[in-house]
Amino acid sequence: MGSWYSGNAADDGANTRGWILGHFLDPSAGERSTKDLEVKWGIHPAGEQRAEWVTGDQRTTLVLLVQGHFHVKFHEGDATLTKQGDYLVWGPGTDHSWQAEDDSVIITVRWPSLPH
């Protein structure tokens, strides 16, 4: 593999829960194997949720709505993504949970890419 790659996010993320870049990819994945960031193509059917809170995560996160209606809960309040291009950013240590209100496609970017 050279210094560039072309693929399909749904296909490439099929065996990694949608994650297409990150430290967890084998180095044979070339440029997609990186400790700098993680990128996920998330397809979430209506009603899917992470009921348990994500706590203590030490990465910065960007969530970008491609389509759908997506709700994120924080201890300090809630945010809803409803319009294509709506996004949220939160810093390390921000606890959260989420729910797809409608069928939703989300791009998630986290940095740096850290083992759990």
Region roles according to the model:
Residues M1-A46, A51-W53:
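A short, N-terminal "cap"/entry segment at the start of jelly-roll beta-barrel domains
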Residues W41-G42, Y87-V89, D102-H116:
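A short hydrophobic beta-strand segment most commonly corresponding to one strand
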Residues H44, T55-V72:
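Short, conserved beta-strand element in jelly-roll/cupin
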Residues A51-E52, V72-K73, W90, D95-E101:
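Short beta-strand His + acidic residue motifs that chelate non-heme Fe in jelly-roll/DSBH
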Residues Q58, D78, T94, D102-D103:
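A generic "binding-loop/recognition-motif" signal
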Residues E76-G93:
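Short acidic-glycine-tyrosine-enriched beta hairpin
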